[in-house]
């Protein structure tokens, strides 16, 4: 994604990196100086290497933070047996209330491990119009990434959440295993100006070690799209939706709950109402549909424009170690971003529209696809069922103005999604098989 989709789509951060607006930081002092700066010269911050951090709270406006390959912000401070000291020294970055238009991409955030002492998170956001993309969050003391307070209009895309360190018991909070990843709304009376935290979670991966809060939310308007859940924690619980006093909705779409003990754990709290729906979601590679978990008044599908991966492809792409969720982007020393990903729907950062015509509207046996005069190359045509299963695929080297006649007589009647792709040019459309 070269720009955010979803509730955080308005985020532009500090703009495109240039020689005049970009600074590279390698130390904690350089990082905090650049974060605090309001000058144009520090609008885009490139993070290089591993930086050991203390907790830093800052108001950010029109700011972009990008990690160069392997960049990491970490705070490993912990004093087991001393809850007060551990809590005081915890946390990495807190985006304060009043922050607006912030982008953070391709960074690893690492904490000391889960320890229930009422400590801080690796990252906490109270800003508006925020895009967090291709980041990896590991071993937060209290949590990995929380959204609360005045935060609103946030998109979290291609992020990975994990716990690689064993949880630490005996903290003052009482939980022996506090690997609770992501909280949206800190209490039933915590909400932004318009009453609900509007958050899009797209192509995210809750991975090994996560136990709860994937996410836990109240007073929220959530869209969970193309996300992947795989953690061997025996008692793990994914989505915990509470109403809060303002009410909550959660639209879960084309997501794969491959390995998770409990997919949904409704929370009875507050004076509002809650509604959750699972649309075309599955449990693992067997593509067993997620059913029987909807409740409340069904939320409507978000009205904003967004791209969708077929659910059958979510596991492969989101968990891909070299081009999936996490800090997997390629970033040059000047801040130019690229990706290792193949040119696939929802994955490529630079997808363009393919110039084609297709007909008829109601197909009996033959689907006709006509390529314009400017199109040539290897065309890959794939057809997916509504649950994301691939039912047809073919490829052919085409030239300008060529027409393909595809015999799809063996496909059963119904609605399908067709994707046609030549290099980084893609066209997707619905077809009706009669």
Q: What are the functions of these language-model segments?
A:
Residues 1-2, 337-353:
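Low-complexity, Pro/Thr/Ser/Gly/Ala-rich linker/spacer regions in secreted
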Residues 3-45, 391:
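Acidic Gly/Asp/Thr-rich repetitive segments characteristic of extracellular carbohydrate-active
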Residues 40-44, 100-102, 128, 152-153, ...:
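Loop/turn elements at helix/coil->beta-strand transitions in domains of secreted/extracellular proteins
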Residues 52-193:
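Right-handed parallel beta-helix
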Residues 63, 72, 163-166, 175-253:
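Long, polar low-complexity repeats
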Residues 65-67, 102-104, 130-133, 154-159, ...:
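All-beta strand scaffolds that present successive hydrophobic residues in beta-strands
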Residues 216-343:
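Extracellular beta-rich repeat passengers
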Residues 349-434:
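C-terminal outer-membrane/trafficking sorting elements
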């Amino acid at each position: 994604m070269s720009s955010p989709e979803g509730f955080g789509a308005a985020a532009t951060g500090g703009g495109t990196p240039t020689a005049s607006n970009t600074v590279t930081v390698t130390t904690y002092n350089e990082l905090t100086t650049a974060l605090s700066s309001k000058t144009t010269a520090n609008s885009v911050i490139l993070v290089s290497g591993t930086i050991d951090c203390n907790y830093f709270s800052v108001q950010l406006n029109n700011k972009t933070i990008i990690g160069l390959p392997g960049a990491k912000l970490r705070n490993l401070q912990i004093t087991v047996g001393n809850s007060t000291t551990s809590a005081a020294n915890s946390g990495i970055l807190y985006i304060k209330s009043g922050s607006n238009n912030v982008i953070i991409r391709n960074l690893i955030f690492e904490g000391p491990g889960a320890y229930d002492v009422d400590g801080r998170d690796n990252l906490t956001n109270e800003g508006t119009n925020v895009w967090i993309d291709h980041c990896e969050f590991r071993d937060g003391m209290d949590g990995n990434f929380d959204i609360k307070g005045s935060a609103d209009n946030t998109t979290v895309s291609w992020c990975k959440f994990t716990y690689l360190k064993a949880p630490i018991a005996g903290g003052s909070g009482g939980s022996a295993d506090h690997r609770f990843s992501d909280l949206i709304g800190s209490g039933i009376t915590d909400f932004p100006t318009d009453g609900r935290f509007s958050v899009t979670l797209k192509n995210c991966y809750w991975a090994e070690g996560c136990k709860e809060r994937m996410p836990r939310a109240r007073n929220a308007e959530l869209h969970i799209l193309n996300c992947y859940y795989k953690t061997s924690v025996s008692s793990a619980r994914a989505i915990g939706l509470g109403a809060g006093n303002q009410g909550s909705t959660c639209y879960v779409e084309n997501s794969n709950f491959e390995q998770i003990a409990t997919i949904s754990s409704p929370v009875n709290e507050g004076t509002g109402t809650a509604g959750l729906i699972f649309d075309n979601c599955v449990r693992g590679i067997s593509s067993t549909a997620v059913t029987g978990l909807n409740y409340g008044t069904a939320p409507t599908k978000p009205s904003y424009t967004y791209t969708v991966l077929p659910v059958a492809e979510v596991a492969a792409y989101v968990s891909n170690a070299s081009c999936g969720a996490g800090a997997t982007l390629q970033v040059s020393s000047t801040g130019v971003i690229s990706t290792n990903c193949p040119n696939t729907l929802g994955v490529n950062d630079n997808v363009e529209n393919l110039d084609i015509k297709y007909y008829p509207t109601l197909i009996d046996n033959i689907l006709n696809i006509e390529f314009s005069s400017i199109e040539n190359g290897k065309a890959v045509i794939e057809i997916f069922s509504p649950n994301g299963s691939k039912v047809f695929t073919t490829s052919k080297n085409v030239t300008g103005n060529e027409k393909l006649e595809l015999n799809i007589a063996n496909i059963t009647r119904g609605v399908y999604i067709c994707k046609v792709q030549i290099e980084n040019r893609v066209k997707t459309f619905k077809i009706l098989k009669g």
